[in-house]
Curated annotation (Swiss-Prot):
Source organism, top-level taxon: Bacteria
Matching InterPro entries: CopG
Subunit organization: Forms a complex with cognate toxin MazF2.
Protein name per the record: Probable antitoxin MazE2
GO biological process, one term: regulation of DNA-templated transcription
UniProt function note: Antitoxin component of a type II toxin-antitoxin (TA) system.
Keywords associated with the record: Toxin-antitoxin system
Species this protein is from: Mycobacterium tuberculosis (strain ATCC 25618 / H37Rv)
Classification via Pfam families: RHH_1
Length: 81
């Protein structure tokens, strides 16, 4: 559980948005916090990738993943019928 002080204007804006979205203020603030933390984590991921890009071995795995299925099995969709 978190508890913090905020400017009256910010509280009024949060209340207005919560009413507009038909959700509770706590849900609005939880979602906003979760989104902000995800954005911060993404920024760290970008920085880590910039400082240490993927190796050739790691890129080879991505190429394998792009191969897809070896054969087209679409004609087997009705095989059990």
């Amino acid at each position: 559980m978190l508890s913090f002080r905020a400017d009256d204007h910010d509280v009024d804006l949060a209340d207005a948005w919560a009413r507009r979205l038909h959700i509770g203020r706590s849900e609005l603030l939880r979602d906003a916090l979760r989104r902000h933390l995800a954005a911060l984590a993404a920024d760290q991921d970008v920085q880590a990738y910039t400082e240490r890009p993927l190796t050739d071995d790691e890129n080879a795995l991505a190429e394998i993943a792009d191969w897809g299925p070896a054969e087209d099995w679409a004609d087997w969709a009705d095989a059990a019928r």
